[in-house]
């Protein structure tokens, strides 16, 4: 069951060509901990350049990181940021929930969406730039841990959220309950191994910040959209990753 869930999650969260089938997808929907588990190999892949290419100029290294991140994960989650950005600027309508939800399905990107994507990507790049002021090993662990945290933030919403409407969000959320969070928490325990390299406080910052970001976005989504959608999950992934890296760097530098 877990192996099948991980395979389904890899197909959903990445562009790795492992194939798609209903059994794996259903297993993934019923196993939120798969989000966190997948964060480990995914985080390792995107963080490797900071160790293997540490002699490369930092701007180039950050560019390589972003290219690998997009190449491995695709643009689905970034598209969620764009849709949420457009929905966030909708106001002064009789039924803001319905209007905002309709914007989520609009294929055109407005100013709000473009701004949201730009701010998120630039924030991520600047966070990684700050991380490179440490050591290659610390940067590697920060980036890896942030990826695990971002995926766990998605799992948190899946376990505790209510779906805004029928769709991808509902397909994931309807299969989980808050009790499904316990395996997610257990899956985070290997990150304790980061403490000797980052320290206890920076490690806690990188792990907890994505979860806090998820709860903040959940509150907004409940009020603005009536619940969680697939776009909200994607936005949480992107925003919490960037926030986690910034939090880790700030606490490390203190």
UniProtKB/Swiss-Prot annotation:
Cofactors per UniProt?
A: Mg(2+)
Membrane-spanning parts: 28-48, 62-81, 109-129, 138-158, 179-199, 200-220
Cysteine disulfide partners in this protein: none
Task: Name the top EC class.
Answer: transferase
What pathway is this protein said to act in by its record? Cofactor biosynthesis; adenosylcobalamin biosynthesis; adenosylcobalamin from cob(II)yrinate a,c-diamide: step 7/7
GO MF terms held by the record:
adenosylcobinamide-GDP ribazoletransferase activity; cobalamin 5'-phosphate synthase activity
Which terms under GO biological process does the entry name? cobalamin biosynthetic process
Q: Keywords in alphabetical order, please.
A: Cell membrane, Cobalamin biosynthesis, Magnesium, Membrane, Transferase, Transmembrane, Transmembrane helix
Q: One GO CC term of this entry?
A: plasma membrane
Role of this protein: Joins adenosylcobinamide-GDP and alpha-ribazole to generate adenosylcobalamin (Ado-cobalamin). Also synthesizes adenosylcobalamin 5'-phosphate from adenosylcobinamide-GDP and alpha-ribazole 5'-phosphate.
Family in the record: Belongs to the CobS family.
The protein here is known as: Adenosylcobinamide-GDP ribazoletransferase
Which species is this record about?
Haloquadratum walsbyi (strain DSM 16790 / HBSQ001)
**Lineage, please?**
Archaea, Methanobacteriati, Methanobacteriota, Stenosarchaea group, Halobacteria
Q: What gene is behind this protein?
A: cobS
């Amino acid at each position: 069951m877990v192996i099948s869930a991980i395979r389904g999650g890899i197909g959903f969260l990445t562009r790795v060509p492992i194939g798609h089938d209903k059994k794996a997808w259903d297993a993934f929907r019923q196993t939120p901990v798969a989000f966190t588990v997948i964060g480990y190999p995914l985080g390792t892949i995107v963080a490797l350049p900071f160790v293997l290419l540490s002699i490369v100029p930092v701007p180039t290294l950050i560019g390589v990181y972003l290219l690998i991140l997009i190449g491995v994960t695709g643009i689905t989650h970034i598209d969620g940021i764009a849709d949420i950005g457009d929905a966030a600027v909708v106001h002064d309508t009789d039924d803001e929930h319905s209007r905002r939800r309709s914007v989520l399905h609009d294929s055109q990107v407005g100013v709000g969406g473009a701004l949201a994507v730009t701010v998120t990507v630039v924030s991520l790049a600047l966070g990684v730039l700050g991380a490179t002021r440490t050591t290659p090993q610390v940067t590697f662990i920060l980036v890896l841990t942030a990826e695990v945290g971002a995926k766990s933030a998605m799992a948190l919403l899946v376990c505790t959220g209510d779906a805004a409407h029928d769709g991808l969000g509902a397909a994931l959320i309807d299969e989980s309950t808050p009790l499904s969070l316990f395996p997610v928490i257990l899956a985070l325990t290997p990150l304790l191994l980061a403490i000797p390299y980052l320290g206890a406080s920076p490690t806690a910052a990188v792990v907890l910040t994505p979860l806090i970001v998820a709860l903040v976005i959940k509150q907004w989504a409940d009020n603005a959209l009536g619940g969680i959608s697939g776009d909200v999950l994607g936005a949480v992934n992107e925003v919490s990753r960037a926030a986690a890296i910034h939090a880790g760097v700030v606490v490390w530098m203190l």
